[in-house]
Amino acid sequence: MILSYSAAIELLLAEVAQLPLAIERVPLLETGDRLLAKDLAAPCDLPHWDNSAMDGFALRSQDVAAASPDRPVRLPVVGRVMAGEQPPLLANPTGVACAVMTGAPIPAGFDVIVKVEDVVQEENAIAVSTPIPAGQFIRRQGEDLRQGSPLLAKGQRLTPMALMLAAAVGMGELPVWSKLPVGLISTGTEVVPWSQPTLELGQIRNSSQPFLIEQLQRLGCEVRAIAHVPDDPEQFAAIAQQFWSQGVRLLLTTGAVSMGVADFVPAALERLGCQTIFHKVAIRPGKPLLFAIAPEHQGLVLACPGNPVSTTVTAEFFLKPLLMACRNEVRSPLWLPLAESVRKPEGLQCFWRSRLTPEGKVWVDPQQSSAALKSLVESTHWAILPAGQDFLAAGTPVEVRSL
């Protein structure tokens, strides 16, 4: 009996121990878009000290409490602090002001900054014509982060903003998950390089390979080896052995996995000593998917159908959950109502291309061919339609995932 999606995922994730990932410390500039492997706490306050949010003058709020346009308060300017300079140590800050630039430390004894444009500047003095509330335009030490407070969370993707935050608190290295070494083999005598300018009758360009390379890199993998083989089991076996000798732990293949005359991958994997965990899942697209373990090489094999859309579905709904489990990541589901009624094959869980409407509903594209690529670019989400129904009425909540 063909496996349900949930049963197949359970079998897949049961083998995640075959792909142990180490934690490694990597220089900050090499961690972009990788996943943090540990929770991090702030090693210091941010800002590190009280500093000025404006170009202006530091003074005491009580010295200008009685200021008015008719009776401005005149304060001598006794110094200047630029960003990066040490503030002057004043014997008595009463009744005086100190010029400060944005980001400069606040001299001791002052509790407010008044902007340059809000004073009248005189020779070596300023005139203030309105009371200023204490604390105005002062960034307090630790108001953004306190030492020891949470900084970045385990599993967080290290975006440019995350790297900025880590740099601001002096982190030169970050703990990230090691990259899983993956080998990628596409198959098919009819498949030619994607850059080939012209095609002969019957040929197709290898569109799945660049997709998988980019997707694997985004998922934190090292694409260690890449190859394409024609419909030749012996050549396929030789390349697979070569990849394993290079330390590949996850072998990802596309094509030759269904029931046709040229679908040699299942038998070739068996001859290589792989143990098939499942072959075929009750889904559309992607039904012929095969998952196996390679005991001699301490690795796993995910053999995907060759149709491009089937490849994207198996990458999203099998490859991604496997890699997330390696890093103990959890994904929160999102459910939205259908914008229109949908008919689907009963008995198959369908992953169909869709878009969100302005009303926050999900519209399922009527074009769901597993070879149709344009709608992939035009879609924004996958709509997950359950196996046990052939008709879902408009308004029915369904789970959706971003493409």
From Swiss-Prot:
GO cellular component assignments: cytosol
Pathway noted in the entry: Cofactor biosynthesis; molybdopterin biosynthesis
Keywords: Magnesium, Metal-binding, Molybdenum, Molybdenum cofactor biosynthesis, Transferase
GO biological process: Mo-molybdopterin cofactor biosynthetic process
GO MF annotation, one: metal ion binding
Cofactor stoichiometry and binding remark: Binds 1 Mg(2+) ion per subunit.
Pfam families in the record: MoCF_biosynth, MoeA_C, MoeA_N
Enzyme class per UniProt: transferase
EC nos: 2.10.1.1
Entry cofactors: Mg(2+)
Reactions listed under catalytic activity: adenylyl-molybdopterin + molybdate = Mo-molybdopterin + AMP + H(+)
Protein's job: Catalyzes the insertion of molybdate into adenylated molybdopterin with the concomitant release of AMP.
Family of this protein: Belongs to the MoeA family.
Protein name per UniProt: Molybdopterin molybdenumtransferase
Organism expressing this protein natively: Synechococcus elongatus (strain ATCC 33912 / PCC 7942 / FACHB-805) (Anacystis nidulans R2)
Lineage: Bacteria, Bacillati, Cyanobacteriota, Cyanophyceae, Synechococcales
Gene name of this polypeptide: moeA
